[in-house]
Amino acid sequence: MSNESQATLEDIKYTIVYNAPIAKVWDAVATAEGLSAWFMPNDLQAVEGHEFHLNAAQFGMSPCKVTHVDPPNRLSFNWGKDWTLTFELKELDDKTELTLIHGGWDANKVTEFGQPHTPIREHMNQGWAGLVKKLQGYVEA
């Protein structure tokens, strides 16, 4: 068991406050149109159990399944075979605090595309840094 816990890699986590109402941020993370505008093309429906795909460009269609929906505060979905992506929203007057959590990282695993989790986690961590800024531009426009 200790080997399993040592192999677990820390979740990627970003918290940012957007100058936008919670409904606008919710639409950006919980609708296919919104998510496509700043992340990846997809066919998301914010309904628990809904299976959908993210179009991961050169990696192809990545299967996902919605696991938790609490509008407009929380959306979680499984992504690929190992990951979970969660968006937590908190209303702050006329602003919104978003916490993005990308979990399910394990040093002993590889993605469905054959890539080891450890270097992919580092790459994705940098990618999320840019994507939360892209989301900011979308919701604050």
Question: Which residues does each predicted region cover?
Answer:
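Aromatic-glycine hotspot motif
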Residues: 1-22, 90-101, 137
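Hydrophobic pocket/interface hotspot
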Residues: 25, 35, 52, 66, ...
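Short beta->alpha connector loops
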Residues: 58-60, 80-83
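Beta-strand/loop substructures that line and gate deep hydrophobic ligand-binding cavities in soluble
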Residues: 81-126
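Short, highly charged C-terminal tails/helix-capping segments
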Residues: 47, 136-141
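Short beta-edge strand/loop motif at the mouth of beta-sheet-based domains
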Residues: 6-7, 13-14, 20, 24, ...
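Hydrophobic/aromatic beta-strand elements that line small-molecule binding cavities or substrate pockets
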Residues: 16, 64-68, 84-91
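Short, solvent-exposed secondary-structure boundary/capping segments
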Residues: 72-80
